[in-house]
Amino acid sequence: AGCVAADFPGRRAAEGGRRIPPSELEKIGARMKGSAALWRRYYDETTGLLVDSEYYEGTKWNYSFRLLHDMQGRVELAGGSEKFVALLDRFFGYGAEPVVRAFDPADDTTRAALYDCHRFCGYNNEPDIEAPYAYLWAGRHDRTAQVVRSVLRHNFTVGRGGLPGNDDSGGLSSAFVWNALGLFPVTGQPIVLIGSPCFREASLRVGEETLTIAAPGAGDEAIYVRAATLNGVSLNRAWLTVDELTAGGELTFEMSATPTDFGAEVPPSYP
């Protein structure tokens, strides 16, 4: 109040360049251009890719566990199921202390810990959102349940900054909902994978039908599926076809607090 624009310090500073002779401005510009070449650049200006990397917004680890059409071939490429599981364990930092993301965007402490946790997964990145389900092709539904529940518990909250990154048109929030329901769709494939349902009961409208998902024993400890039925028929595979899901009916889970051998029949691959 009472301050005229001509006296505003910021304006005087902004107008300072007008008082520098053009010849001096050219010299300053040349020096700045020369100094810029000395700065360390992480990105190639011509491609936007990381320097010395052929990957965008990720590494070979982040893109290695996408749910490709031929996942069985991916398992074989790793040297078999056990070695594939070992790679996934390393990717997720399995067995390490969980890192709780910074719920307050101004909190740099937990954010720094997230990047110094000696693991490669970043659940804020789309390629990594589906990676927990790669365990299913090695017959390890229990690992999928462990990782998914850990992600939901430690990376999401209802408070300020409650998502682990940019929602990207609903990508993260919809991933939370799918995971909490105990289902996860596979991009470009006619299957929906079974994870670890959090809700004791949920009803979904699927086209003109209704699908009821019942997991009466679900809880913070009971994260493993012991048995499942679809419309009363036993289901020992950790996946549904899209046609089965959209036909509606009732999908029921019996939950367990200890790992089970549910999901021994691995999802299909399409060579």
Task: Label the model's feature ranges.
Residues 231-241:
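Solvent-exposed beta-strand/loop surfaces of large extracellular or lumenal domains
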Residues 242-271:
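C-terminal beta-strand-rich structural cap/linker in extracellular carbohydrate-active enzymes
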Residues 2-198, 202-212, 217, 243-245:
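Active-site core of glycosidic bond-cleaving carbohydrate-active enzymes
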Residues 216, 233, 256:
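Surface loops and adjacent helix of pleckstrin homology
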Residues 207, 227-233:
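Short strand-turn-strand beta-turns centered on an Asx-Gly dipeptide
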Residues 157, 200, 234-236, 251-252:
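Short, surface-exposed linear patches
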Residues 224:
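Extracellular attachment/recognition segments
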